[in-house]
Amino acid sequence: MNRAVESSNKALVLEAFDTLFNERDYVAAERYWSPHYIQHSAHIEPGRDGLFNLIKSVPATLKYEPGVIVADGDFVIVHGRFSGHGRPKSWIAADILRIVDGVLVEHWDGQGGETP
């Protein structure tokens, strides 16, 4: 895969995350997540609806700030920070996403509380 595609995939993930996590525009977010989205996270119910329902369940003050982002072919890894969710510590997450035809189709993650 060439760098232009990988750059496009990174931009897609950042736009998708901003649309869902910060703007909370669920209708617009549907265009980024496949209806057959595979969720491997132990913290999120299966599928696109599981992810969307999780975000609907946290306070509207939720904010996502992306950090390092890397692409390798159809995979994008983004390390970011979730705050404003009502818990004492921000969540730090490394999300791995697989993209097919410009849509997020699969997700894995690792996360923990922010440490000073």
Located regions from the model:
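C-terminal and inter-domain tail/linker signature
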Residues: 1-116
